[in-house]
Amino acid sequence: MADLQTQMKQAVALAATDQVKNGMVLGLGSGSTAALMIQEVGARLRDGRLTDIVGVTTSFQGEVLAAELGIPLQSLNAIDRIDLAIDGADEVDPAFELIKGGGACHVQEKLVARRAERFVVVVDSTKLVERLNLGFLLPVEVLAGAWRQVQAELQQLGGSAELRMAQRKAGPVVTDQGNLVLDVSFAGGINDPAGLETTINNIPGVLENGLFVGLADQVLVGEINDGVAGVRDLVKS
């Protein structure tokens, strides 16, 4: 039997997939919960419950999975619209502000989220926080030749920034765009996500950071009640 966290992820992935309609251009997110959603979309295409779906992926990993499942794919440049994007998050606060980028895919994730007519975030209840960055580091994608300079400027903003190192190769993590990632912690968390998102992105050498502000239209939360997995439609505050 799946553990409780997996059950929560499965429940919320199914609930999100129920919003997918025939003929949609669908933003396919990254991460473990989004992967379950992609698998369900593939299953519904195979058995005819869904037809004429076109996917736009947010990571190479998601592209591989979707292709294996037979989901037709297009690049972001090849489509005029995204009807619905479904993606996970590493942290979600009560105002639907997010930190994403644990998988170093936040640049493409943000591009897809901004293009989407509707952006639905799928998380399990462990991802809900009162303030961002108290438990999860903020990813900042930087040009390889500028990471030390950006690190210094982030420190001037009060952040502690470390270069993300790879787990199964020597050296740093390299993003799908060929850049590096600084993981940043701010003492006391982030009290102004919108302002900090803009400030960081204005640092020369920064491509994008993992703060997603004003993008999420809905947050679906997988949770366990009385031992049974269910889904809550989070109310924005």
Swiss-Prot record:
Keyword line: Isomerase
Entries under CDD domains matching the protein: RPI_A
Residues of the active site: 109 (proton acceptor)
**What's the Enzyme Commission number for this chain?**
5.3.1.6
Biological function: Catalyzes the reversible conversion of ribose-5-phosphate to ribulose 5-phosphate.
Question: What is known about its subunit structure?
Answer: Homodimer.
Family in the record: Belongs to the ribose 5-phosphate isomerase family.
Q: Which HAMAP family match?
A: Rib_5P_isom_A
Q: What is this protein called?
A: Ribose-5-phosphate isomerase A
